[in-house]
Amino acid sequence: MDAWRMDPTFAMCEALVDGAELSSLAGGPFDVRAVVAGVRPETKDGFLLDEVPWTHFPQGDRVREAVHLLHTRDSPVSDGTGVVGGMCANDMRAAAALAVPFLIRIATDARHPHRADALAETSSPARAGHFGVASRKELLLHRGDTRYNDDYDDYGVEVTGYPAGWSVTAARAAITADTALLQPLLDDPDPIIRIDAAYALATATDRDHSVRTAFRTRLAAEQDPIVRAALVLATAEATRAHPHPATTTWVREQWRDRTQAPEVCLAAAIGWLCLTDGAAPNDLRATVDHLATDERAHVMEALPWMVFAGGSGETGLQRCVRTMLHPELPEPDDDPWALLL
């Protein structure tokens, strides 16, 4: 706590607690959205880390050091990406958002030994409030406006008092700025890279639908069922953020198509439920209840959406099915008879 009180951002957060208007700080040196937008392309490509004001944000010096070590390959991966992921898990994303452009460049370096780990962490600052979330309303929801919003949004504040929506918006803007670097990773030989590229790209602002088109293009060539499932979920997430009725209809066709792999049908069913608000049709219920076996639920843990949706002893798929289709059932920890079975 003493270290945090010495942090330059502490005065900003203290002022907010004391009643200062958030809008009065927008665009200033402690607005991570403005800082990310101001990072020069040459700074990103050349890893000129000293040009980035890391210390303007909580634990920024740790993030800068982690990016440096990861870039130079001088540390175990846990000392690099682990810092970014750990801070996001602890609800501190502002400095982590500054790392996003550099993590993307590490991920696109085919010779880097930790590129997969860097890519897996790229979207961590771009998501918040998603641990254990498996409802139709919230699973694929982008709670904040990706445009500048100088007031608090549904993300609220981080544990430091910093506006969480600013951090998320900054991270998504960084991903959006580098979609041209990320999209080729959808064709990477490594299926884990393809999955995590889709997961990261799904957070991008996609008003021209180019990202969604890239998902559909890759899907036409993709043979791996679990990667196909990832592409369907990514398409649904992008469509949730930028509605497109024709794509919603297409997602419905995927879970109705009996020639699709079970993982694809399940991903499409979940995605379609998140894109609509009517009662789940009987044929969808029957399809999901038939396909959502325990074995398949564990297979689908390869999808980051499912990893973060899980909780209370349930896999992500199990939690989604219960929450979306069987809300009358209690959570495992809330079932007083569970220990007797």
Where are the model-predicted features located?
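HEAT-repeat alpha-solenoid elements in large eukaryotic scaffold proteins
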Residues: 71-84, 150-160
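N-terminal "cap/leader" segments of large eukaryotic alpha-helical scaffolds
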Residues: 2-75
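Acidic, serine/threonine- and proline-enriched intrinsically disordered linkers and terminal tails
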Residues: 112, 119-182
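Amphipathic alpha-helical scaffolding segments comprising HEAT/armadillo-like alpha-solenoid repeats
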Residues: 60-68, 90-106, 131-139, 175-185, ...
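Extended, charged low-complexity segments
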Residues: 243-341
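Structural detector for internal amphipathic alpha-helices that build alpha-solenoid repeat scaffolds
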Residues: 20, 24, 37, 46-58, ...
